[in-house]
Amino acid sequence: MQKRAIYPGTFDPITNGHLDIVTRATQMFDHVILAIAASPGKKPMFTLNERVALAQKATAHLGNVEVVGFSDLMANFARDRQANILIRGLRAVADFEYEMQLAHMNRHLMPQLESVFLMPSKEWSFISSSLVKEVARHQGDVTHFLPDNVHQALMDKLK
């Protein structure tokens, strides 16, 4: 039986920290679905289609990653995709409390859905898409934190 995992997030935009998590997940699971949430309440900078396209290009070198957009409840999406593992990145202790709430709710909605928490490599443990966008808005150099295609797209958006 194939081990299918979902790595959900807004990915607005996908960062090297996200890539670190998804790359390591590909070594643990047979198939990893990078599930990009529509998240209209977060007012993303990039459209869902743009975020999917950016993530597809950034993960093209990973053979067992599928990138899809979604707007459904995570438990329903996981059930539809026949995945019973959720991958979540934990950067700091502050992330854990929120992630624990999500994990418990997801398990309530789909009892066989397990949450697996991965800590990013030290190099990426302090970055977030929001922080990268904020630094870029103020002309800070964020090249190191983004895949090349994503960096170019961010610079184009900020023009």
Curated annotation (Swiss-Prot):
It is found in: Cytoplasm. GO terms for biological process: coenzyme A biosynthetic process. SUPFAM superfamilies: Nucleotidylyl transferase (SSF52374). Gene3D superfamilies: HUPs. Its cofactor is Mg(2+). One of its GO terms (cellular component) is cytoplasm. It catalyses: (R)-4'-phosphopantetheine + ATP + H(+) = 3'-dephospho-CoA + diphosphate. Substrate binds at residues 10, 42, 74, 88. It is an enzyme of class 2 (transferase). ATP binds at residues 10-11, 18, 89-91, 99, 124-130. The record marks 18 as: Transition state stabilizer. GO terms for molecular function: ATP binding; pantetheine-phosphate adenylyltransferase activity. Pathway: Cofactor biosynthesis; coenzyme A biosynthesis; CoA from (R)-pantothenate: step 4/5. Its EC number is 2.7.7.3. It comes from the Bacteria. Keywords: ATP-binding, Coenzyme A biosynthesis, Cytoplasm, Magnesium, Nucleotide-binding, Nucleotidyltransferase, Transferase. Belongs to the bacterial CoaD family. Reversibly transfers an adenylyl group from ATP to 4'-phosphopantetheine, yielding dephospho-CoA (dPCoA) and pyrophosphate. Homohexamer. HAMAP family: PPAT_bact (MF_00151). PANTHER family: PHOSPHOPANTETHEINE ADENYLYLTRANSFERASE (PTHR21342:SF1). This is Phosphopantetheine adenylyltransferase. It comes from Salmonella paratyphi A (strain AKU_12601).
